[in-house]
């Protein structure tokens, strides 16, 4: 009896998670989508309406630029910082790590927007993609640096020591030994950074004023009519397109690395 109740509870929980996904998959192809699940007349008209909206198309391009740039910069910076904190011993290292994790967890979200707005305005970076990328990188760097530090800690130092004995410089050790061994961890944080940047709404909504610079997370508001009522067909189609880059990136990285956290010795 207990097993049957557990099975029913798990099925109900699975259905609760599956229904929104099923709606997202079916609603874009429905001529007149509702909040329920139905697919009476399959059509591509909703996608046609999305690509006719210049703000929506520009938003997708902006999101790709912002997310890719942030992913590349933050991944490299987090890896190099993690390697330094993992391998180098210097005074105050633990204090710096503690302050970074404290600030990244306490000063975030809405509480950080007012000082960020004032800072970007004083630097002349308000309403610019460069300023937004810098904010993204600064916000995502501490957490991903800690993830990478744990990964670098698991890599045996003997590889680097052997390279130094063979005459390699510290820079060569970093580029030829450390970075290749860190690739699985870098892939993991790259996906995390891309997803966080791609899905962020609050930061670009506040720091960007020009509609032509808005990412897709903000541009979706163009599918609300004059009185604020959502146009379900277009929103569903846009949301479907919006998920494709993230899912594609996850599949590529998962097939190549499998999100296995290993160091120098593969398991």
Residue ranges of predicted features:
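A hydrophobic, multi-pass inner-membrane permease signature
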Residues: 1-267
């Amino acid at each position: 009896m207990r097993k049957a109740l557990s099975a029913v509870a798990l099925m109900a929980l699975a259905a609760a998670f599956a229904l929104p996904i099923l709606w997202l998959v079916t609603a874009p192809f429905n001529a007149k989508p509702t909040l329920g699940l139905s697919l009476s007349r399959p059509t591509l008209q909703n996608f046609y309406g999305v690509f006719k909206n210049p703000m929506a198309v520009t938003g997708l391009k902006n999101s790709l630029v912002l997310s890719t740039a942030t992913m590349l910069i933050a991944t490299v910076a987090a890896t190099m910082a993690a390697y330094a904190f993992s391998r180098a011993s210097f005074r105050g290292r633990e204090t710096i790590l503690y302050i970074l994790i404290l600030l990244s967890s306490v000063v975030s979200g809405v509480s950080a927007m007012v000082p960020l707005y004032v800072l970007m305005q004083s630097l002349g970076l308000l309403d610019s993609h460069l300023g937004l990328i810098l904010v993204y990188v600064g916000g995502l760097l501490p957490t991903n640096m800690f993830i990478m530090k744990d990964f670098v800690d698991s890599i045996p130092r003997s590889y680097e020591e052997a390279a130094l004995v063979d005459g390699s410089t510290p820079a060569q050790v970093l580029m030829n030994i450390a970075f290749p061994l860190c690739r699985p961890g870098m892939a993991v944080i790259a996906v995390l950074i891309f997803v966080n940047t791609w899905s962020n709404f609050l930061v670009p909504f506040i720091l960007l004023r020009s509609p032509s610079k808005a990412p897709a997370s903000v541009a979706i508001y163009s599918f609300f009519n004059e009185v604020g009522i959502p146009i379900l067909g277009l929103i569903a189609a846009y949301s479907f397109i919006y998920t494709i880059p993230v899912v594609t990136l996850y599949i590529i990285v998962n097939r190549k690395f499998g999100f296995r956290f290993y160091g120098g010795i593969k398991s």
